[in-house]
Structures are given as structure tokens and as C-alpha cells.
Amino acid sequence: DKGSVVFRGSAIDTLSAHKRARLGIGYVPQGRDVFPRMSVLENLAIGEEISGKRAPKDRLDQIFSFFPILAERRDQRAGTMSGGQQQQLAIGRVLMGAPSLILLDEPSEGIQPNIVQDIARIMVELNRATGVTVVFVEQNIDMIRAMASRAYVMDKGRITNELSLIHI
């Protein structure tokens, strides 16, 4: 069986990652994938470049308001940051392109519990403040409870169950 991925009425499964980004889809992979030898600011600039859109001057300030640690560490190499800080940087990099959809793959992986809760809270705030849709794949039930407005169980690429939030 084969399906397709449709975004705003168009199939996107054959598009390259940078073309998807230019359509307004931001992707934060499992394991974060920051550029370890580049500074926080350089990593954030990559997000703007990938999106193909010039970010307004206040975009950086907005990201720093959601993730203050990035402002404090703006000149630090990303590879020397903790896992939670790198996750915040990866999300910030995606936000530089002002996506309408953010895909997060296992955002809690390898991150201490208090930072997981901070990231969950910030993602909910981002959704409310900017209207960005956040779709995430996650096994951490606490993060799911904190972030989800809908939940689906998948097995081998198929949705097997839809759960109401009171049953999570």
C-alpha cells in the first residue's frame, strides 16, 4: 500500500526538503541535527536561508523571547550545548522561516524532563501566538498530554486509533 502526502491541496512527497520548507513546512528531526561547529546565530540564519524568505527584524527577538537560552548563548557553538538547548535551537531555526506547519520527530528524545515540559509549553504558546500548526511524533506520554489537542495511534504507517485527550 502506498499513500501520498498532501499539503494545501498539492502532493509534496516527491519534493526535496528545501522545497517543502519554502512551502511553509518546518521540520525538526529526531536527534535535532544542529550544525555543531556553527554558532547559535549562524544556525538560526540557516533557517532563514532555507525558507527562502527574509525574516523581519523582530523575528530573532521573538525566537529569543520563546527560548531565552538562545539569546544568552548566541555566540556559542551549537555542538557544545546540552541536548535540550540544541532542541530549542533546532526549533528556533525552523521558526526563522515562519512556517505554517512544524513537524517534530520525537522532540523529547534524550532531554531532561524539566526541559521537555518547557519545550511542550513553548510549542503550545507558539501555536496560540502565531497560529502555526504543530504535528509531532512522540512516545513520552507527559509531553503528549502537555501538547496535544488531538492524538492518533499509528502502527506501520497506518492510523489504528484516535484517542480523546481524556484517555491519554
Task: For each feature predicted by the language model, list its residue ranges.
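ABC-type ATPase nucleotide-binding domains, specifically the catalytic core motifs of the NBD
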Residues: T14-A17, V40-D58, F66-A71, D75, ...
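Conserved ABC ATPase signature
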Residues: R77-M81
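Catalytic Walker B motif of ABC-type/P-loop ATPase nucleotide-binding domains
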Residues: I102-E106
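Helical segment within the ABC ATPase nucleotide-binding domain
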Residues: Q117-T130
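H-loop/switch region of ABC-family ATPase nucleotide-binding domains
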Residues: E138-Q139
